[in-house]
């Protein structure tokens, strides 16, 4: 779902709402109120129509031969505000999964474009109108789309005993609700990372965060200590930038605000580990370590990293999974740009990591559920096959300007995300509850007192959780 994240990041740079100033994949920022005219970034490049090399074509053909089944209906309909299946002007190229879908099944994905703000209303219109939309982004669809009847289980269309689906069964079971799978998780993908500039680190006497990570010393405490030493607004030295800060940091505790346990939705607002994570963010704000975007027209200042004025920026790998003509404009000279995992919470029992999932939902009334299932298998295969991974790596180097060192760190982030993934699903709660939680968990990093905030929302959140569980059980 990297294209979605890239779009969200671009849009959030344009908003001025204070409530959007902190969280990531489950935070207020990503759940912002986006306008139709804000659905593209300002800087674009020519669409990359380059085809695979002959050797890569052969590798794709071999992988396609390993897939099973036939597909009578070759068209699947995708509803979203972004298109991850085709090359676009944002610098991304056609994914290996789509190469497989075309090669094996002669399949095609028909893109029904919507906006972030209108995606669920458009989905409802299409479902009720019998358009036969097949699938849509799933990051915030469970449980609300289960309750509203906009999605359906995909269990009848896949074989959990097959090697492909067995390889992702555990992560899919994380989101199993009322005995069925509604969230089609094809893979746990790399979560958010910390970007920095090596030249800035060296000039300020800091050890390279990559070396700290390799020694097991890259912790939340070390992260805060480095910010404390660097930040000096009078000298134009700023700390942590980015719209997506709070969620990756609090998920390092291993506890999301809302989760699914034993097939039911559960609130963790009162959990002591969640409390610890919130108070850590209060400390970051209290010490002036978060870039005050109100001083910059509510815009991130990523270019400050390259200029030596900013220490850290939290974002997804999508930030540099695009043409270097785009990302070098914001991050600086490519040899100085690097990233490391979100720091480890040394008080947690494991190195928990904010998880991104390549995941989708099967629409109610889908005209081609079998086609969606086969496409999902192409996606899973593209993540697990060594040749497909190598093709992806070559794309990163040739199309995105990545180095082998970047690819190695990407694999390390993937390992952390796969071993101990944590995902907050409060965005899938009813909109009023989602907004309440979003505003609440943004407060500490903006200077709010977590204890008073928590007291003000606990009763409402608990009631909503009970109502959601009752509604799911009644389906």
Task: Annotate each predicted stretch with a short phrase.
Residues 225-227, 262-297:
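Glycine-centered hinge/linker elements that transmit conformational signals in sensory
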Residues 155-167, 212-215, 256-276, 329, ...:
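Short, solvent-exposed loop/beta-turn-alpha elements that line the ligand-binding surface or hinge
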Residues 4-26:
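Sec-dependent N-terminal signal peptides of Gram-positive bacterial secreted proteins and lipoproteins
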Residues 328-398:
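Extracytoplasmic/periplasmic substrate-recognition and gating elements
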Residues 67, 124-126, 133-134, 138-139, ...:
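A structural signal for short loop-to-beta-strand junctions that line the ligand-binding cleft
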Residues 77-79, 177-188, 192-194, 219-266:
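Extracytoplasmic/periplasmic solute-binding protein
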Residues 113-122, 216-222, 293-307:
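Short helix-initiation/N-cap motifs at beta->coil->alpha
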Residues 9, 23-144, 148, 367, ...:
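Conserved N-terminal structural module of periplasmic/extracytoplasmic solute-binding proteins
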């Amino acid at each position: 779902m990297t294209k979605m994240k890239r779009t969200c990041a671009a849009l959030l740079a344009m908003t001025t709402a204070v409530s959007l100033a902190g969280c990531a994949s489950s935070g207020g920022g990503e759940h912002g109120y986006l306008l139709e005219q804000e659905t593209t970034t300002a800087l674009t490049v020519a669409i990359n129509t380059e085809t695979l090399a002959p050797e890569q074509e052969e590798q794709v053909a071999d992988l396609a031969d390993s897939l099973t089944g036939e597909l009578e209906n070759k068209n699947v309909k995708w509803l979203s505000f972004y298109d991850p299946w085709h090359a676009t002007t944002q610098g991304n190229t056609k994914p290996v999964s789509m190469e497989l879908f075309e090669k094996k099944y002669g399949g095609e994905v028909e893109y029904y474009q919507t906006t972030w703000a209108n995606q669920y209303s458009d989905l409802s219109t299409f479902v009720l109108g019998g358009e036969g939309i097949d699938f849509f982004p799933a990051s915030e669809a469970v449980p609300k789309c289960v309750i509203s009847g906009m999605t359906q289980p995909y269990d009848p269309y896949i074989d959990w005993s097959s090697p492909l689906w067995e390889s992702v069964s555990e992560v899919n079971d994380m989101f199993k609700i009322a005995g069925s799978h509604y969230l089609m998780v094809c893979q746990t993908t790399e979560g958010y990372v910390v970007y920095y500039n090596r030249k800035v680190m060296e000039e300020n006497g800091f050890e390279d965060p990559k070396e700290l990570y390799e020694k097991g010393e890259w912790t939340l405490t070390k992260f805060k200590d480095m910010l404390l030493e660097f930040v000096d607004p009078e000298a134009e030295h700023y700390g942590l930038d980015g719209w997506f800060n709070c969620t990756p940091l609090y998920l390092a505790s291993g506890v999301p605000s809302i989760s699914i346990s034993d097939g039911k939705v559960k609130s963790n607002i009162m959990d002591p580990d969640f409390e610890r994570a919130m108070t850590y963010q209060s400390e970051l704000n209290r010490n002036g370590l978060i870039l005050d975007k109100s001083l910059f027209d509510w815009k991130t200042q990523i270019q400050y990293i390259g200029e030596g004025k900013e220490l850290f920026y939290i974002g997804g790998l999508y930030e540099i999974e695009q043409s270097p003509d785009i990302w070098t404009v914001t991050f600086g000279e490519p040899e100085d740009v690097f990233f490391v995992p979100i720091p480890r919470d040394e008080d947690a029992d494991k190195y928990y990591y904010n998880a991104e999932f390549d995941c989708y939902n099967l629409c109610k009334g889908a005209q081609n559920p079998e086609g969606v299932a086969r496409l999902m298998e192409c996606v899973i295969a593209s993540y697990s096959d060594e040749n497909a991974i190598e093709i992806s790596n070559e794309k990163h180097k040739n199309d995105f300007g990545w180095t082998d060192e970047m690819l190695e760190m990407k694999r390390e982030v993937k390992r952390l995300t796969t071993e101990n993934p944590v995902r907050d699903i409060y965005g899938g709660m009813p909109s009023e509850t989602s907004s309440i939680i979003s505003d609440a968990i943004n407060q500490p990093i903006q200077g709010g007192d977590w204890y008073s905030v928590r007291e003000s929302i606990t009763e409402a959140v608990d009631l909503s959780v009970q109502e959601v569980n009752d509604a799911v059980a009644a389906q």
